[in-house]
Structures are given as structure tokens and as C-alpha cells.
Amino acid sequence: MTSLQQQRVKYGPPHHIKRRPYHPILESLEFQTNQHLIQEYSLDIVNTLSQLESLTLVNPAMIDLQPEIQWFMRPFLLDFLIELHSSFKLQPTTLFLCLNIIDRYCAKRIVFKRHYQLVGCTALWIASKYEDKKSRVPTLKELTIMCRNAYDEEMFVQMEMHILSTLDWSIGHPTLEDCLQLAIDSNNLSNNTTNDIENKSVRPNRKSSISSAVTAVARFLCELSLYDKYFLSVPPSLIAITANLLSCSMLQIPHASITLKNLIEQEIINPQQKKQKKALSSNSSRTTTASYTHQNQSDVRHSSFDEDIDLDSGDEEDDDEDYIDEFYETNNYDDTNATTFDESISKSTTVNDENQPPQIHTPFLSGLDEDSILSIKKICLMLIIQLSKVTEVLSKKYENLGVIQVINNFHSNYKFIIQSIYENQELLLNTINDSTNNNEIDYKLIQSSEILLQFPKFDEYLTEDEDENVSTDDEANSQPQGYDGSGSDGNNQLFTPKSPNAFSSNSSLTLNNHPQSMVPVTPPSATSQYSLFSNKNNRTHESTSGLNSTCNTPTHISISSFAPPQPPPGSILKPKLTSINSTNSLKIKKLTSNSNSSNINIHHGHHNTKQEKRYSHISIGSNSSSKYDGFSPIKSISTNGSLITNNGSLITNNGSFTNIVNNTNSSSPLMNQQQQQQVTQSSLYQHHHQYHQ
């Protein structure tokens, strides 16, 4: 009876119903019909996105004026929003739109520290209403639970109205996901670049697999760009294009590079060639007309004297004056020897060129020019630096998709280039943050970014004769410094140095972890009970690193390949002395007068402070002023099979160190007169021995 009563008591709708998965065939059919309908309005969509991109850009200098919010708080909030986004299974566009709403609001309103998490959750709530379907939108009760009851439901409603009124109810924004899909669609992944003949049934699957892999890696890079301040001042279309190029480079897919090469040739190189041809033709026509006018003037000068005399000058002076006035009114004489051009046409064309907006090409919403290409290379360098600061939340999200393994393989293939970027990290950040020297980036860094992006190569399209005839002063001034690589020669080369063939490397995608790398310190998760943004944590001023988190996500990263580079124990630039049996400290012998060479023997024994002070100018290993000791992407080469270090010391095959005589400073105050004589005698002996040989 009791069991029957319990069964009768259950009223209302059934609970815990398992949702049936949507059929994949129906989903693919809906996607195809949607794409077919969107193609009719593709131009209107791209024009609208380009207008919104210029209107919704955020000025990070305004966020710098916030009294309580600092930039180190941004990773805390972003990790919390990524966890909420993945737990509610929202669309990728929702996360990028949420961050844009937060940045636009913080650039216009003062936000207190205790309300920062409230602004983030409310922005996610607004973005989910704008992008996702109604069943996926989080409720107010769920948001209050996620925030550990730090805010009431009414506070979310009030903050929503305040955000929308601040943004003038304009939420539309070309997110990184939208720009990324435009860039991936322009790759033409359906084109078969191999010579293998494939079945038609296999091609769609191959295309979908390639596009899904490129999308996963590029989306990871786009989400990584949300953490840094620099990417707020860059158009999202250029960030998406750079992420697309870098992901295709990581996956060894040439489609993005080929598409970019065709687009640049079509929109930049070919118009410049046409302009140069017109300039050459106009110069030739001017020279011919100048020669003809010179001949006509010579004929006039050599005419007879009687023809130049007006015999009726006394009778018809008034008529002659009227005729001269009418002649000058009708014919505006120009004394520049027929070398001028029509000013009205030139003014009209220049005015039209200035007033016209930049031409929109499908991935480039802000226009395609040389400045946009340079900014793509700078974004690539900043993304490589940002890869060393990946948080644990982001790495855990993309680890199951295989993105972290692809990045580790990319790091192992381009290890020395990435290390050189890390060594010049401070210089790069200073030049980028400085608005006056924004274009003056190191030539080697630009070249390394081209190699990492697999940037397309361009042949020289100007001959020597054209370079001599065409004056390129205006064009050289318009091109940014440090980009065209022309220097003081003035050659009209469009792009930076020819990078090596991007697809000739025989690198295989193998996982290569480096255990010696440092683990970067990342902020803890924002879902902690004692969150940095909640009211509970404001009572104390304890550091967040010592607080315990209640979330399931660790607070440190497991990606070791993109950590700041550290010298490996068996590096060539820090050699091991195999010929020495002792394990004690190093001791340098004094140079005796009987020595006939400049070899410095290294023995082991106790420390001798006098010897160390005396020979402190001779350093073993790499330069001590370098940030990363022992690491240099460019190795010095010696003809006799030995290796030359950065300080001038020579490492021979038997492991002994010899100091180069020419680099020895004999005038050093640490050397006495006897040692200077020994050095000069040894150098004379070496020259005498080489002369007899």
C-alpha cells in the first residue's frame, strides 16, 4: 500500500528526461541550406561587419584610468567566464561578444573591484541572449549560485539595464569567431593541392576534418588573445587572419598562405605595376613633347626680322590691345614648357581617393594595405609571447582536442626562432607600446614572424630599367620603416626579405615535451569561494596565491614547451668538460714565462681568489649580461671544427678552452707588466710559426 501511495503522489511533468540527440544528417542539411541563403547577402553582411568593426573598437587607454580595476585582474575574470561558458555549453561567439561588452562598458563607466565579477556575469547573460538559443541561456538563479551568492538576482537585472543604456542598446560586434569563419572560408580547403586522385565521397570528410582542425587551433589562439591588453587596440579581423595563418602553419597546411599570396598580388602588386607603367608612359610623352616645343621655339627665334615688326602699329593700337586681352583670356598660357598636366582631373581623383572608404576584401574588414600586413606580423609575435602565459583553464579546455600537442610540436620544430623572440621580448613590447616608434621593429623579428606564419614569397616585379626611370621618393616615404627592407638604397621592393620555402621542411608532428622548462605562474580560478571579486575576499588583504580553491581546475599550466626558455643541461653552448676527471671547482693556472702558447689549462682544486680576480675578464660559457644564458639561435662557426662562443673563447674538439689572442686586452689593469710581455711573446710566436708553415 505504501508503495502504491508513493507512486500516486508524483504529479506534474516528468523529471530527468534524456534529450534525444539531433540527427547529424538533419544538422548537415540545415547547415547547407543556411549557407546557400547567406550567400545571397554576403556582400551586405561583410559591409555591415566592417562598419561595426570601426564603431565597436575599444580604447585600452580609457580602461587604464579605472581607479580600482587593474590589468592583472583580467585573467581571473576571464578564467571564470570560460568555465561558465563551457559549463553552459554556449556558442563560441558568445564568449567573444561577452568580452567586448565588458571592455566597452569599462571604457565608459567606472567599475569597482567588488562589482567586476557582476559585470562579467551580466555581460555573459546578455551575450547568451543575443547569440544562443533560449534553452541554453543561464537563469538568474544559476548565476547567483555560480557567484557564491555574492550578488542578488535584482543586482543582475539592474546591471543589465545599466550596461545596455551605456552601450546605447547596440550590442552587435564582429567577434573573433565571425572574422575567423570568414578567414577559414577564404582558404578554399576544397581545392585539392596533392596529385592523388580521391573519391568524391571522401573529399567532403577530408575537407571537414581539415577545417575542424584549423578552426580548433585558431580558436585557441583567438581566446588566448583575450588575455592581453595589446589585442584590444587591433581590429579583430586582423587577429583572426593571423590566427588562421598561424594555425595552418602549425598543421602544415598551405591553403592560407596561397590565398594570401593571390590576394596581395591582385590588390597590391598589380595596381602598383599599372601605376608604374603609367608613370613611365607619361614620362616618355613629356620628354617627346618637350623636344617638339623646343624645336618650335627655335624656329620662332630664327624667323626673319621683318615678320616680327608690326607695320600698322600707329593706326590700330587699340585694336591690337583688345586682341591681346582677348587672346590671354581665352588661352591661358602656361610657361612650363608643356610639362604640366590637367590639375582639375588630378584634384578630382585625389579627392575621391581620400573620401572613399578602404576597399573591403572578404577576410580583411578594415582594408588590405601594407600597414595591415605589417600589423599581422606584429600580432604573430605577440601571440608567440602570449603562448608562454597560457592558463590552466584554457589548456584544459583544448587538451582533449589535441591542440596542446600541435602547439608542442610547433615549438619543437621552430625552437630556436621562438627562443630568439623570447630573448627580444622586452624590446618588442617597448616598441609596440610606444606610439612614436610603432613601425620601427627589428628586422630579424619581422623575418622570424614570416617564417612562423609561412608567409608567401614574392618575386621582384620591377626591372632595373624601371627602377632607374621611376622616382620612388613618395612611395618610400609612405612605406613603414623596418618593413620593406629597402634601407637607404630606395629600391621599390614591396615586402620583407624572402623567407625560406615554408613547405620544404620534413618535420613530423611528434610530441616533444621539455621537462627543463619553467612552468609559468598563472592566476587561480575565479570560481574560488574566496574570489578576488567577491565581497568576502575584500575583508582581508591576503595574497590570492595562498588561498584554496574549491573548483576542480588546477591553478597552474601543464604546457612546458612554451615556457620561457631555459638552457638544457646538455646544451652545446654550455659544453661539458669530458677530459677532466675531478669534480671540484675550477682553478686557472698562472701563465709562466716558458709557455709558448696562449692556452689556458683548466684544472680542478680549491678556489683561489687572487686568480679569479686577475682573470675575471675571461668568461667561460655565454655572456653574463644575456637574459637566457647559453642560448643563442645563431651558432658561431670555426673552420677547424671548433666552436666559438659569444665572448670570444674557443672550444676545441678535446674539450679544452683557449682564449683568442686578438681579443685579449693587454692594456687591462688586471694584468701586470710580466703577463703583458708573455701575451705579446706568445702572439709573436704564433705568427712566426704560421709564417714558416
Swiss-Prot record:
Induction notes from the record: Expression peaks at G1/S. CCN1 is stabilized during germ tube formation.
GO biological process, one term: filamentous growth of a population of unicellular organisms in response to biotic stimulus
Compositionally biased residues, Polar residues: 273-298, 489-516, 524-563
Alphabetized SMART domains for the sequence: CYCLIN, Cyclin_C
Positions with biased composition (Low complexity): 666-685
Gene Ontology molecular-function annotations: cyclin-dependent protein serine/threonine kinase regulator activity; protein kinase activity
Keywords recorded for this protein, A-Z: Cell cycle, Cell division, Cyclin, Mitosis
One annotated Gene Ontology cellular component of this protein: nucleus
Region ranges (Disordered): 273-320, 465-571, 595-615, 662-693
InterPro entries with a match to the protein in the record: Cyclin, Cyclin-like_dom, Cyclin-like_sf, Cyclin_C-dom, Cyclin_CLN, Cyclin_N, Cyclins_cyclin-box
Pfam families the record matches: Cyclin_C, Cyclin_N
Function summary: G1/S-specific cyclin essential for the control of the cell cycle at the G1/S (start) transition and for maintenance of filamentous growth. Through binding to CDC28 controls the phosphorylation of CDC11 and SEC2 upon induction of filamentous growth.
Similarity remark: Belongs to the cyclin family.
Subunit structure: Interacts with CDC28. The CDC28-CCN1 complex associates with septin CDC11 upon hyphal induction.
Protein name per the record: G1/S-specific cyclin CCN1
Organism: Candida albicans (strain SC5314 / ATCC MYA-2876) (Yeast)
Taxonomic lineage from the root: Eukaryota, Fungi, Dikarya, Ascomycota, Saccharomycotina
Gene: CCN1
